[in-house]
Amino acid sequence: MRTYDDFLMESYQVREKMVADKLRPKYHFLPPHGRWNDINGAVFFNGRYHLGYLQKIRNAPDERDFSSWQHISSRDLLHWTYHTASLDEPLEGKKGDYFNSGDVMDGMEIPTIITNMPRRGICIYQCHDADLSHWTPLAENPVIPIDTDEFPECVIFDPSGWKEGDTYYALIGNKNHRPGYEGDSTSLFKSKDLKQWSYIGPFYKSSRRWTAETEDCACSDFFRFGEKHMLLMHTHHPFNKCQYYIGHYENETFYPEINGQLSHRESLLSGPETLIDDKGRRLFWGWIADARDADEYGWQSIMTLPWHLKPTSENRLNIEPASELQSLRYNPCHVEDLFLEVEQEITVDGLASDCMELKLTIEPHAAQRFGVKLFCSPDLEEQTVIRYDTEQQAFVVDFENASNDKTLSYRCGREVLKSGGLKQTVPFALGDDQALELDIFVDRSVIEIFVNSEVCIVQRVYPMRPDSKEVRLFCEDGRIAVRDIVKWEMDATNPW
């Protein structure tokens, strides 16, 4: 008979393996071990930030995988406490029966989860605890059965919801099969009691000038944004594309006016989730997948840092890192007024690190291509190149030589990125005489680059050499002035 000592020894061995992994991030949240996906159920409640995520544990002997909706909370957005699982394994099926994504409904007096249960349909859970630890299913679950013939044009999948006046609304599914609504879409339902739901119709009509017919509206999140509304989502085809619409909402229909993209396939970022806190901030998290396998390393996937989504006066999107991250800074290093000429590259003393925040102000003077290199080994065998191209009006993150590990597999859905194509291109138009303001967060195997408070570029890289920590600046043509550089080491928030 096995005792707790047996399990404790195994737990110790797993923990030691995690601690020794030089690519395991220190201040980006990730579970203690195992693989997970999709962030769910974000809500600010009773003075705490609460997040859920879908945990998967392989269990080959009975041909099933264990699936649960895990629950964490924090007072400061940085240090997270584990709760018992919000929703535990309720499924009676074979391997592949997982929880699907869901949402804590907005505007509710009683915290309410709406989610899709495989082979059952849309289910609702409510909680009366101050710490949101115990969730009770409605007796009427599933409130929208997956096998119903009542809504033939709807796809029962990935719900989100909110309360408006005395009416509950839910966006159900990532497609709608009504003719004329091809491409990404979702279906609107409403209810007076959370138990009986009526179908309204397609929530919005997508346009091929913005999105392809193959795209869908998964992990939807709909909310007021400035004077408009925003619909946030990700698509499966192409994979790793988080995008949003900003538009107006009227008579139970959303009319998109602006389309924007938060991530590109090479970023491995998907599964967006937001909440609004007691400061009125709309905070965003995304799920960043891995190019390494959990079976070999014992863990897989991380969360983005918390992003603050802000509407501009023109009802467009600005993105900034949450201000709480500043409390992790220590050991500052400040450099001013560096000038680079044609085909010049320099290493800046004092900046080498694999866990830091790096802020730069760069003025391009007739330079077309310039940028910064991170995770550089002294001989440049390993390097990650972040290049801005003024002619192309885009950033190119070149991670072709970011790692000498040739077993990495950057999966984008069914597609695997091949050597020779390990580049991420992110459109960004720099105005005339405008400086580049870069706020770069480096955390061992992930980079997040906030650009002029307008976009955030995410990239996973896996430098293997212990000396791959140098920071270099380069100018390929013209001339640039680097007016200001500040680097801070960043304190760890993960226990290991």
Set out the residue ranges of the language-model regions.
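Beta-rich carbohydrate-recognition and catalytic domains
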Residues: M1-D158, K163-A212, R224-E266, G286-E336, ...
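Beta-rich accessory regions
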Residues: E10-R15, H248-W496
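Short, well-structured alpha-helical interface segments that form or flank functional binding sites
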Residues: N37, C217, L269
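Functional cores that coordinate and move charged inorganic groups
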Residues: A218-F223
